[in-house]
């Protein structure tokens, strides 16, 4: 399984190269990791590309929208930083809070997209509810991701990028599935409900 995780990791990184496909790539990465690696269904690459095609439009929309949103917040944060006044300091903290909330929503949004079929706006709302309701999980996942990125940039060799995203995704499924199951309907009789195993 470790070999498949590395292969999926490489495919994931290649899929992110167009940039606007990052959201779709993350969604498909989680889907294949959960279904094929953890639940031994089908082939990882087959499931990855199946999810990629299915979520391409929504995933791309999220990526572009998030890029614009974060760029706007960063721009406003820098304007507030230049002001050097109490109001500017308050606004910096406010914009930082918005970034944290955005990150918390995104942590759940891509797994939600991989599992549920609904409007994108409904997915965002559901992800926000999950982030608040399961705040300890949200904190662990966000802190873990930030810590991994920091450690990789500061201490680990560059080639580790071919390992750590897959390792984080695999580990993250154990917490994420506990959350997703709370919102999933009971499986129909005869259904291959791999996500309930």
Residue ranges and their predicted role:
Residues 1-95, 102-197:
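Helix-coil boundary and N-terminal low-complexity module in membrane systems
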């Amino acid at each position: 399984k470790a070999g498949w995780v590395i292969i999926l990791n490489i495919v994931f990184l290649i899929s992110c190269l167009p940039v606007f496909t990052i959201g779709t790539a993350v969604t498909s990465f989680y889907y294949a990791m959960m279904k094929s690696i953890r639940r031994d269904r089908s082939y990882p690459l087959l499931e990855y590309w199946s999810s990629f095609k299915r979520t391409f439009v929504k995933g791309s929309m999220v990526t572009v929208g998030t890029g614009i949103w974060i760029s706007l917040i960063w721009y406003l944060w820098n304007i507030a930083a230049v002001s050097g006044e109490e109001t500017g300091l308050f606004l910096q903290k406010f914009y930082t809070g918005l970034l944290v909330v955005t990150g918390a929503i995104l942590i759940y949004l891509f797994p939600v997209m991989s599992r549920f079929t609904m409007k994108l706006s409904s997915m965002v709302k559901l992800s926000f509810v999950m982030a608040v309701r399961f705040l300890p999980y949200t904190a662990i996942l966000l802190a873990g991701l930030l810590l991994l990125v920091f450690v990789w940039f500061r201490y680990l060799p560059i080639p580790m990028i071919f390992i750590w995203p897959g390792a984080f995704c695999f580990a993250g499924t154990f917490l994420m599935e506990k959350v997703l199951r709370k919102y999933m309907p009971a499986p129909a009789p005869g259904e291959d409900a791999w996500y309930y195993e």
